[in-house]
Amino acid sequence: MEKLVHKEIEKRRRQEMASLYASLRSLLPLEFIQGKRSTSDQVKGAVNYIDYLQRNIKDINSKRDDLVLLSGRSFRSSNEQEWNEISNHVVIRPCLVGIEIVLSILQTPFSSVLQVLREHGLYVLGYICSSVNDRLIHTLQAEVNDLALIDLADLKDTLTLMK
């Protein structure tokens, strides 16, 4: 009798685990479980997917914070004119090709920005400009041969203090 009870409990446990693993598989994108048969591979795929999502969340939060910093000070400040009179705003972060520079410059000619980048040994590969709250937001991707040789803090200070 005791063996039958134990056997039945074990059978239910296996069925429940199979159901849970099937549910896990249904939640994961195919590229994270493709070709993986064992449950340990599926769990590892789930862990990788969670890590992937966490990195994406950090990247998106960082971009949101940068955009709020560059364009949304008027949300935090009651005096919008104060925001418009503030100096240039610069955010520099690593990207696949080197670094990404997001900046909002007031009266600085854009050619001066390009000159500073050239002086720091950066080669612009991509550029996007958009208008947010009547300010231009410039986003540049620059190739960097050796990131260790570039003083990002100095570059940020130089771009921020440009007139």
Curated annotation (Swiss-Prot):
Domain of life of the organism encoding this protein: Eukaryota
InterPro entries: bHLH_dom, HLH_DNA-bd_sf, MASH1/Ascl1a-like
GO molecular function, one term: DNA-binding transcription factor activity
GO cellular component: RNA polymerase II transcription regulator complex
A Gene Ontology biological process term: regulation of DNA-templated transcription
Annotated keywords: DNA-binding, Nucleus, Transcription, Transcription regulation
Subcellular location: Nucleus
All residue ranges annotated as the bHLH domain in the record: 1-53
CDD domains per UniProt: bHLH_AtORG2_like
Pfam families: HLH
Known partners and oligomeric status: Homodimer.
Protein name (database record): Transcription factor bHLH118
Organism of provenance: Arabidopsis thaliana
